Amino acid sequence: MQTSKNQDELVKTFKSILKEERFGSQSEIVVALQGEGFSNINQSKVSRMLSKFGAVRTRNAKQQMVYCLPAELGVPTAGSPLKNLVLDVDHNQSMIVVRTSPGAAQLIARLLDSIGKPEGILGTIAGDDTIFISPSNIQQIEDTLETVKSLFNYTD
């Protein structure tokens, strides 16, 4: 008879598999945890863990509904792990668009607003995972784009 791994290992593995953003149902999470050696796991335990850690269902990059954990974020600074939340930076002739991990856009927009006009950012509008940046001067949008990319160490 296989013994169940301890609670700390379960929590660590649970968080790790949710970061993969590929599990759309609680039963898929149960199967994944059982595959990792947690033989005593069941749907009700998974449900309680999802609730305890504040997991939500959201769309992943493939537009599939999946469970994920909210980002554990502190005060925003350019040197903090916020750079890991920026997934894409693009622009057209009048606007820069930043795509982030789900739930991170408003926090990153707050950081961008705080650096403001001196760095070429007139203002931002943020949703859940997308930020629209209006540059101070459209003729210098390339400079503003490079500033945003360098803030988050983003490379194409």
From Swiss-Prot:
One BP annotation, GO: regulation of arginine biosynthetic process
Keyword tags: Amino-acid biosynthesis, Arginine biosynthesis, Cytoplasm, DNA-binding, Repressor, Transcription, Transcription regulation
Predominant location: cytoplasm
Pathway the protein acts in: Amino-acid biosynthesis; L-arginine biosynthesis [regulation]
GO molecular function, one term: DNA-binding transcription factor activity
Compartments in which it is found: Cytoplasm
An annotated GO cellular component: cytoplasm
InterPro entries in UniProt: Arg_repress (IPR001669), Arg_repress_C (IPR020899), Arg_repress_C_sf (IPR036251), Arg_repress_DNA-bd (IPR020900), WH-like_DNA-bd_sf (IPR036388), WH_DNA-bd_sf (IPR036390)
Family membership: Belongs to the ArgR family.
Reported function: Regulates arginine biosynthesis genes.
Protein name as it appears in the record: Arginine repressor
Lineage: Bacteria, Pseudomonadati, Pseudomonadota, Gammaproteobacteria, Alteromonadales
Gene from which the chain derives: argR
